[in-house]
């Protein structure tokens, strides 16, 4: 892989590294805290586990890859279902085991090469599953934007959520430079200010919260049903991880798929995810926003991500930060979520397009159709006390159909890359 850009001096003094690291955390901050706020997890804990997860990832990769790990959007709906069905502790127990998916894929890549992932999880499998992740969350976004199950008046809810959505859209489309990377942050700020003028903010939790507070740690509990439900969901973000590593490789001009190797980056992501769940935080994933910031600032030094992780851990011990985040009205988050969740579905569509999946071919048509119908229609399968439904069922069905249905004779067999 060649680098089109002139080389960048990696050596910087610690003060500059710390400042740029804080800048990287700021870029990731909006999306990082959005996941716990939506799912009911603790925002300070999410900051803590993002920092720890990034440090563990760096440990596994020899601190060679300038990438930041934080809360994964792919797990929002499963966490919401798990918390409602089994509680936070059991949901965390199931999420601990999702790291095993990364471990298994890491081993597969180590033995068979990176091309093995493409054969087991081709775009026709991953694409529709990602679409279902986004579409399954759409009703949640709309309900929050309309102020359902809350004390907000309909007119206030629609006004604030639409203003938030339009702000986020505007920044994402028209902003330049670093501003373009933080549309979620701008949307939250505008929505929050509007809520202030409407008298919808209660600052009492912030006043009561201490400056220093240990993040809320949840000890995981393990239940087979929760584990089996959550395991398959890790497939989509694990495969997307490959795209994240390819993106940062392109930005820096270094082939991280070869050194430190995809098997090590997958292992690092898996350990980060399991560690986060052990502490009560959401699973981690690579952040494209931070990769974009690396490209803009041309700071390719992996030590910057060490500083970003340290900042995240330090801020997680400030009780007033978590209390302030808890005051963000759900109608503000609803406006942002309508764009975010829709964009997840678009990523799934993009996966199919980039993979040049012929949807008119009978085999591909059957796989995509069944997965989409199962996901949107709410299909579930019971095995005694164990139930498969939603994204987990869709992932299992997509994999099985891909393995069972014969490939067209004129379909070229991809070689290991």
From Swiss-Prot:
Intramembrane residue segments, as ranges: 365-400
Subcellular locations according to the entry: Cell inner membrane
Function: Transport of uracil in the cell.
Residues in compartment: Periplasmic: 38-41, 83-90, 146-154, 199-223, 319-331
Name listed for the protein in its UniProt record: Probable uracil permease
Cytoplasmic-side positions: 1-13, 62-64, 112-123, 171-177, 248-260, 298-300, 354-364, 401-416
Organism listed in the record: Pasteurella multocida (strain Pm70)
Keyword Cell membrane: yes
Residues spanning the membrane: 14-37, 42-61, 65-81, 91-111, 124-145, 155-170, 178-198, 224-247, 261-280, 281-297, 301-318, 332-353
GO MF assignments: symporter activity; xanthine transmembrane transporter activity
Sequence positions that bind uracil: 73, 240, 289
Superkingdom assignment: Bacteria
Entry membrane topology: Multi-pass membrane protein
GO cellular component: plasma membrane
Family: Belongs to the nucleobase:cation symporter-2 (NCS2) (TC 2.A.40) family.
Catalysed reactions, semicolon-separated: uracil(in) + H(+)(in) = uracil(out) + H(+)(out)
